[in-house]
Amino acid sequence: MAGNSIGQLFRVTTFGESHGLALGCIVDGVPPGIELTEADLQHDLDRRRPGTSRYTTQRREPDQVKILSGVFEGRTTGTSIGLLIENTDQRSQDYGAIKDVFRPGHADYTYEQKFGFRDYRGGGRSSARETAMRVAAGAIAKKYLAQKFGIVIRGCLTQMGDIPLAIKDWDLVEQNPFFCADADKIDALDELMRALKKEGDSIGAKVTVIADGVPPGLGEPVFDRLDADIAHAMMSINAVKGVEIGDGFEVVALRGSQNRDEITAQGFQSNHAGGILGGISSGQQIVANIALKPTSSITVPGHTINRAGEEVEMITKGRHDPCVGIRAVPIAEAMLAIVLMDHFLRQRAQNADVIPPLPRW
């Protein structure tokens, strides 16, 4: 099965299934000498892990990461870093009823069509449980980027259903279960989530992730543009159905005189491009938005077919998130960090001697 790796020089390969013994990943390309402990990775894993609030799946996994290789005496050795998280709270019996039934909106049907066989327990490899390893790998990238270049990567929920959320206070994001930066909307989100749980339904969301401090010059023309790689990484996250860089689809309604980011001796006057021009970072904030569909794992009855092709009614049992966008925040941060780390190493490999002729604002 191909498609389990991302990155060229900073390369992350994950393995494992939702109800398997463990999840794991191999991280190649980590520079030597970085101080690294399991605690450095655990913070973001705790932000992503299930069972931390009444608004997310009640599957309770400690998600304690183990560093198996690539670190000696608290420092990276430059060799492959092996990471492992054991699964401890599987309830595979919850999925016995769907062994021969395809859940609508899930990957059951497509995995069966592709492989002729599937692990039906919690979605197997297609489950968002896999993203725990991306978050662990992304934490390595985030630490390196912050220490070496002062880059800060942050994300937050910016819409749930029809409730738009402003980015007002980054400090608030870690103080509420929604990863929301808009204190005025938290009560509305709470009310919506309570209603969804009562109805047995779910809702979509938008997540915004921003990188501050990225220097100009990252990105490879033409097929490895920075924004193309970011979009690729974000689209690989479960339930993501759309990605915007900068103003995204809003540029359709703008004129060129409005959309272009004019430059003065003091710097750029706007950032409609989201910090990327011609596929290369401009030195401004990198801004990406992702749209996540509402999960199809709901108790509202729906129509589907079984393996015999017969029409059946489907009610999904198990433990699921009413809004998968909430826990997607640390995942999106991790994917942006992985892409930026990869492009930093690629830029250093080819253009280490280049001295930018223009100032960086």
Curated annotation (Swiss-Prot):
- Subunit structure of this chain's protein: Homotetramer.
Catalysed reaction, written as an equation = 5-O-(1-carboxyvinyl)-3-phosphoshikimate = chorismate + phosphate
- What's an example GO cellular component term for this entry? cytosol
This molecule's function is given as: This reaction introduces a second double bond into the aromatic ring system.
UniProt protein name: Chorismate synthase
Q: Name one GO molecular function term.
A: chorismate synthase activity
Q: Which cofactor does it need?
A: FMNH2
Matching Gene3D superfamilies, A to Z?
A: Chorismate synthase AroC
User: What pathway, per the record?
Assistant: Metabolic intermediate biosynthesis; chorismate biosynthesis; chorismate from D-erythrose 4-phosphate and phosphoenolpyruvate: step 7/7
Keywords recorded for this protein, A-Z: Amino-acid biosynthesis, Aromatic amino acid biosynthesis, FAD, Flavoprotein, FMN, Lyase, NADP
- Top-level taxon in the UniProt lineage: Bacteria
- In short, the EC number is 4.2.3.5
- Where along the chain is NADP(+) bound? 48, 54
Q: Could you tell me which PROSITE patterns the record lists for this protein?
A: CHORISMATE_SYNTHASE_1, CHORISMATE_SYNTHASE_2, CHORISMATE_SYNTHASE_3
> Which residues are FMN-binding?
125-127, 238-239, 278, 293-297, 319
Classification lineage: Bacteria, Pseudomonadati, Pseudomonadota, Gammaproteobacteria, Enterobacterales
InterPro entries for the chain: Chorismate_synth (IPR000453), Chorismate_synth_AroC_sf (IPR035904), Chorismate_synthase_CS (IPR020541)
**What family classification does the UniProt entry report for this protein?**
Belongs to the chorismate synthase family.
Q: Which GO terms describe its biological process?
A: amino acid biosynthetic process; aromatic amino acid family biosynthetic process; chorismate biosynthetic process
Name the source organism.
Answer: Enterobacter sp. (strain 638)
What's noted on cofactor binding? Answer: Reduced FMN (FMNH(2)).
